[in-house]
Regions:
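Non-catalytic cap/lid and distal C-terminal segments of serine-dependent acyl enzymes
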Residues: 1-225
């Protein structure tokens, strides 16, 4: 209660407001130079007309408007469907309550096959968890250096994937061998490998990219197009 989120909306020039567009939902705001990439892909016809929603993690402010708590880990690293529920019931309805600069209604497809979610680090695991618990909302997931470590239970997800019938979700996972290590939480790169192995075992449609990068979106941005 009381948590505030800032978000930005990307509307491609090709959007006519007459039928629902696909959705790209980006965590931690605009990453990977996404609007520029989307402009290029939509114009070339390699990507359907897609509205981008870029959300910052929540903050709580005092009566003077000063931030007194950052809620990123509590929202993004949790391993249940809470944040996905917020996307469905709070964020997307707020987005669709707006109009474009030229007065068009913002219409977003309800088909999960038309929806992708992405993020890096804690945003990466949040993307995975949102689709995992709510495949009716998202069926495309793009993650880089995801925090699948022992922070808030993310380390248990690969075992859950192996033990559960596969769902209609497609995944892209990227990480680098120089990703961060923590003596309590573990090694980010190793847990990304474990997650990819579990998804492959369970029969998911999966694409991976491994390099020698660190805990950064630099290489993930390179791969994004």
């Amino acid at each position: 209660p009381g948590t505030m989120h800032e978000y930005k909306i990307y509307i491609p020039q090709e959007y006519d407001g007459k039928k629902p567009a696909c959705l790209y939902f980006g965590l931690d705001g605009i990453l990977y130079n996404a609007p520029v990439v989307m402009d290029s892909l939509i114009t070339s016809g390699d990507m359907p007309i897609t509205i981008g929603v870029f959300v910052q993690p929540g903050v709580i402010k005092d009566t003077n408007g000063n931030v007194i708590r950052y809620n990123r880990s509590n929202e993004f690293d949790r391993t249940d469907g809470t944040f996905a529920h917020s996307i469905e019931t709070e964020i997307l309805p707020a987005v669709e309550s707006h109009k474009t600069a030229d007065g068009k209604a913002i219409l977003i497809s309800k088909d999960p096959n038309d929806r992708a979610i992405s993020g890096a680090s804690s945003g990466g695991i949040c993307s995975f968890v949102a689709a995992w618990f709510r495949p009716d909302l998202f069926s495309r997931v793009y993650t880089t250096c995801g925090t699948y470590v022992a922070m808030r239970g993310g380390n248990e997800l690969p075992a859950l994937v192996r033990k559960t019938e596969p769902q209609a979700i497609r995944f892209y996972i990227h990480d680098g061998s120089q990703d961060v290590w923590n003596p309590i939480f573990g090694h980010w790169y190793e847990y990304n490998l474990l997650m990819a192995s579990a998804l492959e075992f369970a029969g998911y449609e999966l694409e991976t990219k491994w390099d020698d990068g660190n805990h950064s979106i630099k290489n993930g941005s390179r791969e994004f197009p």
